[in-house]
Design a protein with these regions (language model features):
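N-terminal intrinsically disordered, cationic/polar leader segments
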Residues: 1-88, 102-130
């Protein structure tokens, strides 16, 4: 059985941008560091949420996980697990927004099923040369 630990949750950027944004946007970047015991996986998550017709909220977070006994081959085969961690990173971004900008708790955010992220994860794994 694999143990997954959350080892880092941090807010990098939280700004209100005075430009219109039609709909929610997001992006993430996987940064795995493989070791003898497993992999440290940092996920940078960027979230852009419309506040009103003239402004949006820009949030960048970092969530770190330690995935015990993961090597490169196992990491590549566990797309569903990684998708769940990206989904967790997205939820962490929302929680950090709620903590730091309580007056903006009304801002709606769409959550996605973890399968939604799988194509991008596969692409990033390929780009990492794994």
């Amino acid at each position: 059985m694999t143990t997954i630990e959350v080892i880092e949750v941090g807010l990098d950027t939280l700004e209100i941008i005075n430009e219109p944004l039609e709909e929610q946007r997001y992006g993430f970047l996987l940064s795995p560091a493989f070791g003898k015991e497993g992999v440290n996986l940092r996920i940078r998550f960027e979230l852009l949420l419309p506040i009103n017709k003239k402004q949006y909220l820009f949030c960048k977070t970092i969530t770190g996980f330690f995935l015990e006994n993961f090597n490169q081959d196992y990491f590549k085969s566990e797309i569903e697990t990684i998708s769940g961690l990206v989904q967790t990173s997205m939820a962490n971004a929302r929680l950090l927004i709620m903590q730091k900008q309580q007056k903006l708790n009304y801002v709606q955010m769409k959550y996605f099923d973890n399968k939604y992220f799988q194509d991008e994860i596969k692409l990033q794994i390929k780009e990492l040369g794994l």
